Each structure stands twice: as C-alpha cells, then as structure tokens.
Curated annotation (Swiss-Prot):
Regulation of activity: Activity of this regulatory enzyme is affected by several metabolites. Allosterically and non-competitively inhibited by fructose 1,6-bisphosphate (FBP) and unphosphorylated phosphocarrier protein EIIA-Glc (III-Glc), an integral component of the bacterial phosphotransferase (PTS) system.
Annotated protein name in UniProt: Glycerol kinase
Organism: Escherichia coli O7:K1 (strain IAI39 / ExPEC)
CC terms in the record's Gene Ontology section: cytosol
PROSITE patterns in UniProt: FGGY_KINASES_1, FGGY_KINASES_2
Pathway field: Polyol metabolism; glycerol degradation via glycerol kinase pathway; sn-glycerol 3-phosphate from glycerol: step 1/1
Segments forming a coiled coil: none
Function, in words: Key enzyme in the regulation of glycerol uptake and metabolism. Catalyzes the phosphorylation of glycerol to yield sn-glycerol 3-phosphate.
UniProt-annotated binding residues for ATP: T14, T15, S16, T268, G311, Q315, G412
Catalyses which reaction(s): glycerol + ATP = sn-glycerol 3-phosphate + ADP + H(+)
Annotated PANTHER family: GLYCEROL KINASE, SUGAR KINASE
Gene giving rise to this polypeptide: glpK
EC number per UniProt: 2.7.1.30
GO-annotated molecular function: ATP binding; glycerol kinase activity; metal ion binding
Amino acid sequence: MTEKKYIVALDQGTTSSRAVVMDHDANIISVSQREFEQIYPKPGWVEHDPMEIWATQSSTLVEVLAKADISADQIAAIGITNQRETTIVWEKETGKPIYNAIVWQCRRTAEICEHLKRDGLEDYIRSNTGLVIDPYFSGTKVKWILDHVEGSRERARRGELLFGTVDTWLIWKMTQGRVHVTDYTNASRTMLFNIHTLDWDDKMLEVLDIPREMLPEVRRSSEVYGQTNIGGKGGTRIPISGIAGDQQAALFGQLCVKEGMAKNTYGTGCFMLMNTGEKAVKSENGLLTTIACGPTGEVNYALEGAVFMAGASIQWLRDEMKLINDAYDSEYFATKVQNTNGVYVVPAFTGLGAPYWDPYARGAIFGLTRGVNANHIIRATLESIAYQTRDVLEAMQADSGIRLHALRVDGGAVANNFLMQFQSDILGTRVERPEVREVTALGAAYLAGLAVGFWQNLDELQEKAVIEREFRPGIETTERNYRYAGWKKAVKRAMAWEEHDE
C-alpha cells in the first residue's frame, strides 16, 4: 500500500482554475493554473462556459500531479474551493449545461431584484438568508435561466435538470454524475437557503418559482462526499472530502475558527469575514450574515463585508492614469512623500459596496492644492484601500460587539508593506501577514484532510500558520481619528453623484 502523503486543493476562481498539492506540513509542493474565457454578451452581463470550467479544472489536476511527479495513489483526499454564487443548470441525463454559467458579477437580474424589493421581501430575505437583495446571489440567476430557456421549468419539475454552484458542478463531473451535493457555505450564497434551519427555504423557492427537485443535497464542509477516479476508469479512487466557497475557505485557511477572529482578502476588491461562532448576527450596518466553518468544518456563522475596489484602484493608476508602470511600483512612489498633502481618493468607480451600498456614488479626488503631485495621489489611492477596510471593520464591531485584536490578511496586495503598515496605523490594530499566501487553497486542503484523518485536528495545523510579519500601529489616536474623519467627509461628498429619479 502506497503511503498517502499529499492533499490536493482545487481552486476554481473567476478568471482561472488552479490545483495545488500540499504535504502533511502544509507546504505547497506544486501548483498548476489555467485561465479561461470571460464572456460578455451585453454590457453588465458576465458568463463562463461550464464545460471550459470543467476542462481547465480537470486538466490542472492531471498537470499538478505530473509536475510534482506524484502518483494518484499518494493522494489522501481532494478539497474544492470555488468562486461563489456563479450559477449552472444542466441536464441530469447527459451532463450538458442548458445555458452558460451566469457569473457572480453579472447584473442581468437587476429587474428581478427590483420586483423582490417592490414585493416587500427585503426583511424576509435578510432575516432568513442573511443576504441583501442583489443580482450578486444565485437565486435570481436560476430564475432567469428557467424563465429564458424554453421548457426548462417543466423539465426541472420532472427531475430532468439540476442546479449547482461551481463546487456542485465539479463534483458531479468528477463522480460521473453519481453525486449531487453542495456545502453549507456555498448554499448560504444562493438566496434560496435558510441559514437558521439549514435547509432550502420553501418561501424563496416559491417566490422565484424554482423547483426543489433540481437542488443539490447540502452537507458539512468537511466530510467524504464521493470518490473520483484520476486517470479514468480503473484509476485510483480518491475521496473528495472538503468544500467551501473561496472567502470561507480563506477564513478557515487563516485558522479564524474562533468567535471574533477575522481576515481580510485584498484582491480586485476586499472581502472581510469575521467568525461569530454559533450566533448568526443580523447586521444593522450593511453587512451580510453568512455561514463559515468551525474547527471541524461544522456550521459557524460569519459577518461579511465586500468592498468593490481595492487592487482594482491600483490597476487604474497603472492602466488609465499611467502614473505607475507596475502595481509593485505604487509602494516606491507612495513612500517618496511624507503624507498625502491633504488629498483623499475615493475609488467609487462602480458605486460603493459595504457598508454604504450606494450604486450612485462615483470616484473622486478631494483636497487638491497647487503643491500636490503624482506621488501624493498614488499614496492617497493606496490609503483608500485601508480606509475602506476600516469602514467595514467598524460595521463589524458595531454588529458583533466584538473588539478585534488582530487582523489576518491575504491576497495579492498584502505584499505591499506600505499598505499593510498604513492599514495597521488606521485601524489601531495589529495586522498579521502569513508565510503562506495561498490561504484559500490551504482552507480547502485542511477541510479535506481533516475529514479523512490526514490531520487529526486543527491544533496540528496551528504551528503551520506561521505569521511572516506583524505590523503594529505607529501613529497616535488623535492623528488616526483626524485622518479617518477626512476620509468620511470625502466619501460623503462622493455619494449619490449620479443623478437618479426618486
């Protein structure tokens, strides 16, 4: 019997599919990645081809093993993490999608959402699903597909069609259609799932006219769902034993499994999640209530705040403003000046997300005087990422009544030392940057490994969560509050910029 030395994490993201091999010490042995096409049929619409998602993801799995020179029988288990909310409907018999995947960013269901608001469902949806009414979530996307593909609703009622988020689709394909399953974290992003009863919500299914027959079974984030053969029939059967949506996987990968622990992922946007333990905290401050993973993958709750523009505002400095050649240059130029010279940049290019939720806000630069140069603007843009994070954190502390002691960070922008130091300064809190930056894949691997006994419990992993660097606040409270007050003033003036009819 070959020794099972490794765990594979499949990380199916918005722009690429990745596979990561990890050993028992949580070291990354090899990584394989393939990008796939973004389809934009109309302005504001975003789709993916589900067959291409499957093709890229399955090929990275084969590639990553070949790269590491590892045979399939050395793999103890596979964990899956995925872009959340993205919606796929396919034929049970053939495994063929009846429409492209409708991606989380897609805004085509705005009108359905307006109807839900007009029907007075906001409070029901917030109380029972933990979400706000927005095209972001899967429910209205499923309705759209059933409304627009002829005969599909009847076929779904007859049990001929299946719905799934990306995790469900991948497992269906990996098990040759034997297993139709999702986990609590992904289900909590559909707007069809009751986060208190932990079951599909009959009222939401009725409102959106979605047949229950097409929905997957919902399971814990860490258990064996089925087996997959790597290398076709007769190949080694490997358990698939971990599933979590990408942000929840990152929370678990950062080992934020105790009440009050939080992480912030700095990507295109920012996603901050705080574990609230066994209490589902209803937000009064513009956050989402969502499901997270406890220490053994059981149901915990979390508060989540999404900021639309983080890394994207650095890309704007590079691509549109041409102030830098490379995102990495932003740190160099920002540190060429002592401060922003009174300038604030509000990067509300597509409106503002949490905690404001103002689609009519637009980007702005305030406080310009004759002495302001490009470096001040670069610095102010970086600072805006930290200010927006404080906005979300203040909302979290108000909702949860928990004071944060340290913020764990991950994502591309955490390599920027200036930003991380300023983040600590403006929060007045320690910022902890981990050694391993691949925390989303780590989370999926941990969930899978725990389910099959590859790791006994999280205590084994605690020492693996090495903090590479800790940033501590370096400014006085009065200075911090003065700067943050300036930011609040700037945001207020950027809000409701686009005229709209009441």
